[in-house]
Swiss-Prot record:
<dbReference type="GO" id="GO:0009512">
    <property type="term" value="C:cytochrome b6f complex"/>
</dbReference>
<keyword id="KW-0934">Plastid</keyword>
<keyword id="KW-0472">Membrane</keyword>
<keyword id="KW-0813">Transport</keyword>
<dbReference type="InterPro" id="IPR003683">
    <property type="entry name" value="Cyt_6/f_cplx_su5"/>
</dbReference>
<dbReference type="GO" id="GO:0017004">
    <property type="term" value="P:cytochrome complex assembly"/>
</dbReference>
<keyword id="KW-0602">Photosynthesis</keyword>
<protein>
    <recommendedName>
        <fullName>Cytochrome b6-f complex subunit 5</fullName>
    </recommendedName>
</protein>
<dbReference type="GO" id="GO:0015979">
    <property type="term" value="P:photosynthesis"/>
</dbReference>
<dbReference type="InterPro" id="IPR036099">
    <property type="entry name" value="Cyt_6/f_cplx_su5_sf"/>
</dbReference>
<dbReference type="GO" id="GO:0045158">
    <property type="term" value="F:electron transporter, transferring electrons within cytochrome b6/f complex of photosystem II activity"/>
</dbReference>
<comment type="subunit">
    <text>The 4 large subunits of the cytochrome b6-f complex are cytochrome b6, subunit IV (17 kDa polypeptide, PetD), cytochrome f and the Rieske protein, while the 4 small subunits are PetG, PetL, PetM and PetN. The complex functions as a dimer.</text>
</comment>
<keyword id="KW-0793">Thylakoid</keyword>
<comment type="function">
    <text>Component of the cytochrome b6-f complex, which mediates electron transfer between photosystem II (PSII) and photosystem I (PSI), cyclic electron flow around PSI, and state transitions. PetG is required for either the stability or assembly of the cytochrome b6-f complex.</text>
</comment>
<comment type="similarity">
    <text>Belongs to the PetG family.</text>
</comment>
<feature type="transmembrane region" description="Helical">
    <location>
        <begin position="5"/>
        <end position="25"/>
    </location>
</feature>
<keyword id="KW-0812">Transmembrane</keyword>
């Protein structure tokens, strides 16, 4: 009963973590871009 729960949690968290990392990296890139200009 634990394995399906863990797999569900992982499957739910992985896309959220990836999107979070992409958003933070994009925001940092935009911030550095605006600071350079």
């Amino acid at each position: 009963m634990v394995e399906p729960l863990l797999s569900g949690i992982v499957l739910g968290l992985v896309p959220i973590t990836i999107t979070g990392l992409l958003v933070t990296a994009y925001l940092q890139y935009r911030r550095g871009d605006s600071l350079n200009f």
